[in-house]
Amino acid sequence: MLATTDMLSRLSDVRGRIATCRRAVDDDAGASVVTAAVVREFDTKADKAMATADDARRDAIIELEQAADSARVAAKADPDLGSTALDAVEDAHLAICILKTEV
């Protein structure tokens, strides 16, 4: 299990990947409104996880992983989503999955 400072540092890195993911989807003209909405929710959950008290952060990370799963499914199902946006969603999803195994 990660120490609190390590967990926050790792979560901050994941937060950056999620922000990149959101920008990529927002910038993709082919992204559906559904994909964009699900990715925005993923981004919102990341903000929530960063602001969560230390003793509740593990639960927030689990909730964030669930949002990542939803974003990944939406992105993979979006036929007009570009490869850059899809890759960014996959990267953010993988990052939170790895973090979850460490907490």
Positions of predicted regions on the chain:
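Function-determining surface determinants
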Residues: 1, 5, 33, 58, ...
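Short terminal alpha-helical segments
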Residues: 1-39
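Short, charged, amphipathic alpha-helical segments
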Residues: 8-12, 33-41, 58-65, 83-90
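Extended alpha-helical protein-protein interaction scaffolds
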Residues: 17-18, 46, 97-101
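Charged, low-complexity interaction regions
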Residues: 23-34, 51-57, 76-83
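Long, amphipathic, charge-rich alpha-helical segments that form helical bundles/coiled-coils
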Residues: 38-43, 48-77
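Amphipathic alpha-helical binding modules
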Residues: 70-103
